[in-house]
Amino acid sequence: MAGASTSRKSYGRIFTLLRDHNKWFENSIPLIASENIPSPAVREALISDFGNRYAEGWPGERVYAGCTYIDMVETECMKLAKKLFKAEFADVRPVSGVVANLAIYSAFSDPGDVMIAPSIPAGGHISHGRKEHSGTAGLVHGLEVEFYPFDAKSMTIDVDATKAKIIDLEKAGRTPKIAMFGGSLFLFPHPVKELAEFMKGRGMHINYDGAHVAGLIAGGQFQDPIREGADTMTMSTHKTLFGPQGGLVLGRNEHAEGIKKAMFPGLTSSHHIHHMAAKAVAFTEALEFGKKYAKDVVRNAKALAESLSGLGFKVLGEDGGFTKSHQVAVNVLEYSDGGKIEARLEKANIIVNRQLIPGDIKAGRHYLHPGGIRLGVSEVTRLGMGTGEMAEIAELMKQAVTERGDPKRLASKVKSFRKPFQKVQYCFDKKLPAYEYVKLR
């Protein structure tokens, strides 16, 4: 009986914590660049019975029975993805952006091959990383990873230095098999067009990791990697592309079979069918509302960056206008380190993440206490905020970072600021409040 009592208490506590989390975000300013808020329709798809089913393989070629409606939804999902990104081929099965990248590694390289990618302090993602850093490319697939030369002033890849490095690698018999563009700190477009011909002339497969900027690409507000020369494009589906957590691979028909085999049976069994259905819903929303949303996101990011700079913050990328994406990067070393600033802001219910920035590793700073913070405006934009609100957010951040006033009082200000912004915009159905806890028991 004691065990039953304990389990019952845990049962109740879990749901209490879930409700508390929703209430917290209802009263916070969410600025995590890798997050967004799904529409009520996407949430509805996520709780469908699809989440209880298996559908191994490709539509029409399943290992299991009972997939009639799953196949129809997945076929529609692929059709929508291809339309959204103007792609010949789409595989909607990756359960994350990391799995999407693994599909590329598996399909187009072998362990021991070389890949060139952005380093983490230069904005690269851990899935692009070396084995010694526990990066997916090195640790899981056995790739030897070289890093692009990076221009810290312009916050993008140095084209001429990259060409020189690849020539040196070629002379050493280490021509990269894969060139990876994209990253997790991604302020400006990467030079795909400028490097594509040079890379393809050396037999390199070009992949563009659009995890962060997929929604901006779909909305015509960033760059167009496939038209610029990328062979394939990977992404997650829950950042600027406002769907459920998941991944997606795009490419040309000539790449389809390799990707399909990598995904199944290589990397997935069930591919979380309810998330696939929710992706399909999100793609319809992106096709209908994505252009305006992407434009508003970029406008808001620039407004937030300019407001922070005007308040004395050292915002990275000033020479290029601070940002052309949803992100803003700030060097906070004059106040403290990124970890401590993240904690100060969280006390005020302003949610950001610490960020390694160029120069950190050479200075001996690591991920727990880096020199910067990263901000993203995807979620606050979807809640209906505009450039005026970005100026208010900058002022609230200044108060929190400089510790002017009581954190509890500042959290109360944040709560008042958030009160008018409680519905998801850029979607077909706005009935359910964005963070309302839906009780099914």
From Swiss-Prot:
UniProt cross-references to CDD domains, sorted A to Z: SHMT
Principal place of residence: cytoplasm
Site residues, Plays an important role in substrate specificity: H238
Disulphide bond pairs: none
UniProt: (6S)-5,6,7,8-tetrahydrofolate binding residues: G124, H125, I126
Cofactors: pyridoxal 5'-phosphate
Keyword Transferase (UniProt): yes
Keywords in alphabetical order: Amino-acid biosynthesis, Cytoplasm, One-carbon metabolism, Pyridoxal phosphate, Transferase
Entry EC number(s): 2.1.2.-
The keyword Cytoplasm appears for this protein: yes
Subcellular location: Cytoplasm
Database matches in InterPro entries: PyrdxlP-dep_Trfase, PyrdxlP-dep_Trfase_major, PyrdxlP-dep_Trfase_small, Ser_HO-MeTrfase, Ser_HO-MeTrfase-like, SHMT-like_dom
Pathway annotation from the record: Amino-acid biosynthesis; glycine biosynthesis; glycine from L-serine: step 1/1
SUPFAM superfamilies from the UniProt entry: PLP-dependent transferases
Function: Catalyzes the reversible interconversion of serine and glycine with a modified folate serving as the one-carbon carrier. Also exhibits a pteridine-independent aldolase activity toward beta-hydroxyamino acids, producing glycine and aldehydes, via a retro-aldol mechanism.
Protein name per Swiss-Prot or TrEMBL: Serine hydroxymethyltransferase
Biological source species: Cenarchaeum symbiosum (strain A)
GN (gene name): glyA
